[in-house]
Amino acid sequence: DSRTKMAQVMVDKVFSFSELGFQEYETAKYITEILKENGFTIETGIAGIPTAWMAKWGNGKPVIALGSDVDCIPKASQKPGVAYHDPIIEGAPGHGEGHNSGVPLNVLAAITVKEIMERDKIPGTLVLWPGVAEEQLGTKAYFTRDGYFDNVDVCLFTHVSSNLGVSWGEASGTGLISVEYTFNGESAHSAGAPWRGRSAADAVELMSAGWQYQREHLDPLQRSHHIISNGGDQPNVVPSQASIWFYFRQITYPEIMELYEKGNKMAEGAAMMTNTTVEKRILGSAWPRHYNKTVATTMYENIKTVGLPTWTNEDQMLAKAVQKEVNSKRDTDGMPMKIGEL
């Protein structure tokens, strides 16, 4: 309670930055300065990512890591405290998924736990890290690849939700692969000599159309989305290069790979039909999450002890207005009055 104002200031400050993935420079500078002032050592640019960092304090076991995402969403600019769509800047990015809240609250938790550990001479190490470019699957796999979690005993991950709770076992969310297919053909003048060209854009369109026909045969839990990330330069030139960007989602690793292989075959087929070549580039990955029961049940007891915040009438009015605005079917009664189920 003594740090309520600090919490609100930090959450609002990160909200004001509204930085897209791999562009979280102001957020990184702001958060790491606060951690430095409170005795944490900072390593910046981890895993070769300029906006990524890791903060540490303490020594010995257990090593407890606190993580949360920090990037925002394109074209989600929004005035705070307004229930309807009202951007601060039209078309600008914004924190439409609440990624402005997690890391600030982890910082406050870490500072508080650090004080308790110092007072009671409790051994252990606290680690904080940001989920940079989470919306693009940008970093967590690379942190793991480069060994940043090798000595971690437990990782507690924070994300905004409709209630205060914790879970264990398989997560409800999917894992996925982010992959971009780039087709290379032959440029030509579209009017003067189109027969000399081999259109990479045609290959992209064929892959997109082919995947739409594939959807009927996907498992109910399989999800996929794609955009054309490069469609060529201008209409009077046969595009020599074009790209299409896919997310392939599923609950288990084998099923994610099954979707990925289907995508690869479709890309090869599109290249064959257009006499182009194709290259694939994995941009990121996130495997399905599995949460620890012992950690979850222990945290849940603490959640029951702490309880929910005391909501004001203004809090409830805004929450209900937002729920009505988005036509929510699940949450309609404003802020929760009971702690969520484990």
Could you describe each region identified by the protein language model?
Residues 1-95, 100, 104-124:
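Acidic/His- and Gly-rich active-site-bordering loop/insert found
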Residues 3-4, 11, 15-18, 39, ...:
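Sec/Tat-exported extracytoplasmic proteins
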Residues 8, 32, 107-114, 141, ...:
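Predominant activation on well-ordered alpha-helical scaffold segments within soluble catalytic domains
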Residues 14, 35, 55, 66, ...:
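Divalent metal-coordination and catalytic microenvironments
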Residues 19-20, 129-133, 283-288:
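Conserved short loop/turn motifs at secondary-structure junctions
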Residues 43, 63-67, 127-130, 155-157, ...:
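Structural recognition of the beta-strand scaffold that forms the well-ordered cores
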Residues 85-94, 100-101, 117-239, 249:
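Histidine/acidic-residue-rich, glycine-tolerant segments that coordinate divalent metal ions
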Residues 205-342:
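Metal-dependent amide/peptide-bond hydrolase catalytic core
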